[in-house]
Amino acid sequence: MNEINQRLESLREVMRREHLSAFIFPSTDAHQSEYVADHWQGRTWISGFNGSAGTAVVTMKSAALWTDSRYFLAAEEQLKGTEFQLMKLKIEGTPTISEWLAQELQGENAEVGLDGMVNSYHETMGLIADLRKSGGITVRTNFDPLGLIWTDRPAIPANPVEIQPMEFAGETVASKISRIRTALRQRHADGMLISALDDIAWTLNLRGTDVHCVPVFVSYLLISSQQVSLYVDSAKINDEVKAYLTENGISLYPYNKVAEGLERYSEYNILLDGDETSYFLWKTVKCQEIIAGKSPIPAMKAQKNDREIAGFRQAMLRDGVAMVKFLRWLKPAVEAGGQTEISIDRKLTSLRAEQHLFRDISFDTIAGYQLHGAIVHYEATPETDVALKPEGLILIDSGAQYQDGTTDITRTIALGPVTEEMKHVYTLVLKGHIQLELAKFPDGASGTQLDALARECMWREGYNYLHGTGHGVGAYLSVHEGPHQIRMEWKPTPLRAGMTVTDEPGLYLSGKFGVRIENTLLIKDYQTTEFGKFLQMESLTLCPIDLTPVDFSMLQPEEIEWLDTYHRDVFEKLSPYLEGEDLEWLREATRLVDRVMSSGR
């Protein structure tokens, strides 16, 4: 019996003792985070699947894991040899968790368990309603079996908190809290609980290292009309940060006392976001009225101020320098032999680490060679790592956390000769990428309304990709930031000037190769006419796009013009920071398209 199946047996012993028919493990923590500290990696521990999104469900006789298209291939590999059955979200015929449980527990007097501290209020209430409809299955929300069976479970992290200087933050804590309180008054709320860690870090101009690749710290923030209370482990707070918080009128309380703080909130109306607040904490509130609604903070955080935008530009310059040095090194190193997916990841990270204000990578690098490139969120391990050859395509999706900005970039590189199919698919992705960057659109249009621009050239040939086309990017915060997105599914959040968003269409041919090209963009003003205000997008990312696999006959004149303009901008901005072979490589990589075509590459 392998380790995962042994853990399932231990879990079932506890379930039997607690009279539970099933237990649900989400991917989230007590703050509904996408990326979580090791302490809350319960779904990974019980299933072996380490993707950032997914839900594991275990009954006394079976086990299943639901995840989205980014992780289908990775999940298939990681679940091999375990009892877990892969459930592919948004694929026809895939049951919901409630439907599957209703079928699996049919005829039982069943009770399903979950930990109400790590499941959101909205998801839990939806599950309770669905299971009730599906045959009277009840849900127990106050039990965490991991506390009994995960004997070497990591502690909740207690790493030091740091102040994010005004030169990078661009807005004082007092100003942010004032804006939040104004938004609360407009909703007739006296206060709100903030659970989302990046929202807390942004509001207080603080950063931490509690979560891998995301500069946040585990805490809660309770804002009322008269007081601001930070619930955090005191071990994180040094004298400098404590004085800073006192200066800004922030009271400190122990992290594990947040429920008591909410219980005292009985005389006021409180705003709670059911997607970000845990079921347990929501049920703790005893105030006159809970005002259910979206937190105002993500929309504020999404529109970057002038200093944040300036920080992004500087971070992208340094990141571009690191990327050019890496790409100049890559092909000769592969030709010399001895390079693998893991070794080039280490090389790229080392080049970024040389840059000023580098703090960390912004997510685990995706370096997928050939067929591994078709795994959307592939992560090389010692077991899957492969040697690189001077042929075919490698997809490299990577990013960094600099103190003045967060980067996210994908380049697909031809390491040598490529097939005609590779050229065709690569060029389709490039066309989609360019068409989105060329967009001009009304202020307030949604990302869903723009999404088809990146896909239309692919749809005409029967291709598609199932992940989103773009997401927001934090200012030295999470590389995935909302509330805006560019995706097929309806997402009505308006796009506004000052928002950052990625442009990352891709195509993935299972068992063959994958292609993705990604820049981080800034939404900014375009023009105002009698029909209103219009916006456009500017690429913040500065790195050549590989022209070797391009079929130029597929490109329209405006697409060629965009490539030339972009590469001219990349050269002008990066060349002052490069010399020798790196500078010559950049000059060659940013040649005008007609020169590339006339030279036969």
Which residues does each predicted region cover?
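Active-site neighborhoods and metal-handling regions in enzymes and metal-associated proteins
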Residues: M1-R601
